[in-house]
């Protein structure tokens, strides 16, 4: 049975959404990918949507929406995106904080950099799960 991984931050509109999308690409054979937050936004960050579509061919407007922690199933692994003091708590067997800067309001270059970091971290995470390290 695949592990369930949740990528979490406060608003579930940018980094956690990017991570969910990339988890569905690079971890799909190894884990189920979810994202959530303690608050939702009416729409996902449109810069994040555009960058993920340009880089990976995935339209997050079609495949995802902003969700609350209570909207997702019980998970095995919680990945915090890096929300400092106000990061949401989600019960899980394993919790990590990736400490990513929020690119909201910054240049496309920052969004691309964030996406590439998330991609590498997800590939790493998938390998650890595959090797039964998590």
Language model features by range: what are they?
Residues 2-134:
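Short polar/charged helix/loop
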């Amino acid at each position: 049975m695949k592990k369930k991984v949740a990528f979490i931050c406060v608003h579930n509109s940018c980094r956690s959404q990017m991570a969910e999308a990339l988890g569905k690409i690079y971890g799909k054979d190894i884990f189920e990918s979810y994202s959530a937050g303690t608050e939702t936004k009416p729409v996902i960050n449109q810069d994040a949507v555009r960058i993920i579509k340009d880089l990976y061919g995935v339209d997050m407007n079609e495949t995802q929406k902003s969700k609350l922690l209570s909207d997702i199933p019980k998970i095995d692994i919680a990945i915090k995106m890096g929300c400092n003091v106000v990061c949401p708590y989600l019960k899980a067997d394993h919790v990590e904080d990736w400490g990513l800067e929020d690119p909201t309001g910054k240049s496309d270059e920052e969004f691309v950099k964030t996406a590439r970091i998330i991609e590498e971290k997800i590939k790493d995470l998938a390998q650890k799960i595959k090797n039964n390290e998590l």
